[in-house]
Design a protein with these regions (language model features):
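Non-heme Fe(II)/2-oxoglutarate
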Residues: 1-67
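Catalytic core of non-heme Fe(II) oxygenases with the double-stranded beta-helix
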Residues: 43-56, 61-180, 184-192
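Membrane-proximal basic amphipathic "stem/tether" segments
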Residues: 187-213
Length: 213
């Protein structure tokens, strides 16, 4: 795994409710694009470059689209398979104090995937929690994903996919995972936005690298 100082803080919903008294970010990330990870040591670059390329592949994307067909059809209709999806894989690291309140993902996203990367089964109870929204507005817990090796989840993003994460406790050193987000990639505005975000993240990473050097 990369060193802590190779990561940078997350933003947006991924940091909601995750502040600590000392102000330290509780979720950090590494975008798994070659231009972003090029500052990693060569042995680590070789590993994460392959991981990023596989996760951005058409084969992986098509497999998720096939398995999530009911949810995608519910949102996009019968022609869901023709909706463009732009993959953005990131390596994330959460530390004690991290939490996320109940929310649904932004509709800029089409598919959300999280792949857990724990070293063992010692922290099974810190996986993502899924909720059901009842007619009275309450959102009780339906299930919780176990945070164990070779596991994770994926769902088609819609306005009923409520989920959260309980606070990561002091007994956990890091909560490592890969977030693979497929952003809806149709229409000129969405297409430009998706690529502009990648360019913007590249420049932020270069500035950060210059400050560290």
């Amino acid at each position: 795994m990369p060193d802590d100082n190779d990561y940078r803080p997350m933003s947006g919903k991924s940091k909601m409710g995750s502040s600590r008294a000392d102000g330290k970010p509780t979720r950090t990330k590494i975008d798994l694009f070659p231009e972003y990870i090029r500052h990693l040591p060569s042995d680590k670059f070789a590993v994460w470059d392959v991981v990023g390329r596989v996760l951005r592949s058409e084969e992986v994307k098509n497999a998720f689209i096939q398995h999530l067909a009911p949810g995608l059809m519910k949102r996009f209709g019968e022609n869901f398979a023709g909706v463009g999806m732009y993959p953005v894989p990131i390596l994330t690291r959460d530390i004690p104090g991290y939490r996320v309140f109940k929310h649904t993902d932004s509709l800029w996203k089409g598919i959300t995937v999280q792949l857990y990367l724990p070293a063992d089964n010692s922290n099974k109870n810190i996986g993502t929690i899924f909720h059901e929204r009842l007619p009275d507005g309450t959102k009780p817990k339906v299930t919780q994903m176990p945070f164990v090796p070779n596991s994770g989840y994926a769902f088609a993003v819609w306005n009923d996919t409520w989920h959260s994460a309980d606070p990561v406790g002091p007994e956990v050193r890091t909560r490592d995972s890969i977030l693979l987000t497929y952003f809806v990639d149709r229409g000129i505005w969405r297409t430009l936005r998706n690529r502009a975000r990648r360019v913007g993240n590249f420049f932020l990473n270069e500035l950060r690298s210059l400050k560290r050097s």
